[in-house]
Amino acid sequence: MNQIPGSDVGFLGPSVALAVDSAGGIMIAYHAGDSPGAPQKMYIRDSADGLTWTERMEVSNGSFTVNNAFPGLAAGRTPGDFRLVWQDDRNGSTNAWNTWYRRTANGGRTWSQALRLSDLGEGAPYKTEAGYFFPYGDYLEIAVDGKGMTHVIWGEGLSYTGPGGSWYTRGR
């Protein structure tokens, strides 16, 4: 087992996701800061054998002031098809978290534009047009069914003590 360089602990603590595609290609997603306690970006790395890994590639929005956390990763039906979800506060404050989605069809060389999944500004007292107050990132999952449909569920709420809710969406 090897430590991933650049995966220093920040405020949100480390979290990582792993998926293996139909050809055995391995991808990991994780968040890391440039220094301990700094806002963290979302990165991916991939490997054909689990022994050698590509350099990390940033897949979040590139800002040094945005917190990114809690990745979820799933493999699609074809080699190189991976789907990534995570939560970040790019909409301006720590009370404006959202759940984001990106997809690659070529093993991570290129990615779709980030799609905001948590785009409902109502339905709960902790939601605004900008996002939700607090991410329950340890309650985030992504799966791909036999037809290639992506399914995502996540938790969000008012604070780490609640109340909160679970939200679900699906799509290609």
Where are these predicted regions, by residue range?
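Extracellular, repeat-based ectodomains that mediate carbohydrate processing or recognition
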Residues: 1-172
